[in-house]
């Protein structure tokens, strides 16, 4: 099973949707861009199209000419990136067995990290065995958005959620049998990290693109950081 432990005292680098600030997201080109600048894992989204084909995209509106199928993406990592961690984020439900079997068929189980914001999906993947499993907290960034007219209410809700996140992490890990909590950077705190570590689980912060945020979550003790621009690691955590 893939390790999510820090290396050389720094969090692991996870390229978000490849490296979304450097190349088109969720594409083979994006995966190559992430590898070129240096990452420990590459993250990509998986959805089911209306024809039931599993493809690499965040949503149906994002499917285009460059969108690889899940099979094409897994073949890329099996052939062109034989030592890289593969972070598969499930945006659809109900195809867990098919996805895990495909990961297994390409010989990627030992370096796969499969995540979802859906409790049932994470629990199902964990029950299937093999791949490391993470539960995303919260399920979508819109749950904690501070934009628009509702910003004052969102901010108060965010503060409340940040306070209770340390108490939520343990039960979510227990219910899902996940071994990692994938926590939005705004909810990361030393208390949340300690709560996960007490259960033997890693903490992955998402999505961090600013050096000051990277420094903050690293200081909080997270084990890995998801970023659209992996280059920020070199400038922020060089020492």
Labelled PLM ranges:
Residues 1-239:
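Phosphate-group recognition and catalysis centered on beta-loop-alpha active-site segments
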